[in-house]
């Protein structure tokens, strides 16, 4: 399969690599759509992501695709499901480090609920957040909609972390994709006031008015 590689800071190439082999708790996903993360991906390409200084690495973590194979212990994914958040955390002996590896033709999702039940996924293992966000989406959700939810799930997580409940007021600083998502989700959550204090571009002001 093909994957997007950063061989060294400031460089990007497409490289042929081995297709992942899933274990009993995983599903194999054929990628349909990916999105570029302005923070993580751009910093990995620039060589400025904190704690990552070993290259080459496989790029990407925002994607959507269709399940094409499932492990024997998987219960929460089935053939044909559209899922988000697939990764490749280990490229084995291919000499490639993982920058999450989501910009690959095939990626892997883990059945997080089964892993928890069997004591194989804990916060201490460092896989908790990565596996928890790997989910199937409803069948009517299109690939371009599903991949955007990769950003929305992070915003939703922030709402939960800060205990944002209906009636509370929020000021959003910044009007990029994440800032716009905060405003939109704030309205859906019934927050009392959702203002963006960092709007610079007029088209984003107009876009916000549609919310």
Spans of features found by a protein language model:
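Short N-terminal strand-loop motif that marks the start
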Residues: 1-59, 122-129
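Cofactor-binding loop segments of dinucleotide-utilizing enzymes, especially the Rossmann-like FAD-
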Residues: 8, 32, 70, 175, ...
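Short beta->alpha connector loops
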Residues: 10-11, 49, 88-90, 152-153, ...
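Glycine-rich beta-strand-centered segment in the early N-terminal region that forms part
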Residues: 20-35, 48-92, 99-103, 108, ...
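Mid-domain Rossmann-like dinucleotide-binding core that forms the NAD(H)/NADP(H) cofactor-binding site
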Residues: 139-211
């Amino acid at each position: 399969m093909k994957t997007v590689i950063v061989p060294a800071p400031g460089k990007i190439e497409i490289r042929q690599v081995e297709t992942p082999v899933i274990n009993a708790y995983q599903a194999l996903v054929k990628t349909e759509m990916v999105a570029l993360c302005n923070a993580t991906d751009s910093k990995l390409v620039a060589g400025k992501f904190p704690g990552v200084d070993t290259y080459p690495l496989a790029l990407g973590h925002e994607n959507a695709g269709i399940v094409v194979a499932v492990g024997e212990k998987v219960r929460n994914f089935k053939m044909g499901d559209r899922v988000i958040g697939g990764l490749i955390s280990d490229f084995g002996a291919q000499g490639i480090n993982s920058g999450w590896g989501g910009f690959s033709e095939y990626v892997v999702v883990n059945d997080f609920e089964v892993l928890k039940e069997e004591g194989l996924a804990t916060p201490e293992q460092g896989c908790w957040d990565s596996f928890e966000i790997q989910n199937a989406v409803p069948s009517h959700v299109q690939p371009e909609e599903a991949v955007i939810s990769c950003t929305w799930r992070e915003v939703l997580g922030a709402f939960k972390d800060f205990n944002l409940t209906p009636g509370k007021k929020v000021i959003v600083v910044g009007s990029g994709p994440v800032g716009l998502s905060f405003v939109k989700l704030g309205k859906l959550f019934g927050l009392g006031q959702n203002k963006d204090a960092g709007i610079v571009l007029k088209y984003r002001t107009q876009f916000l008015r549609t919310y």
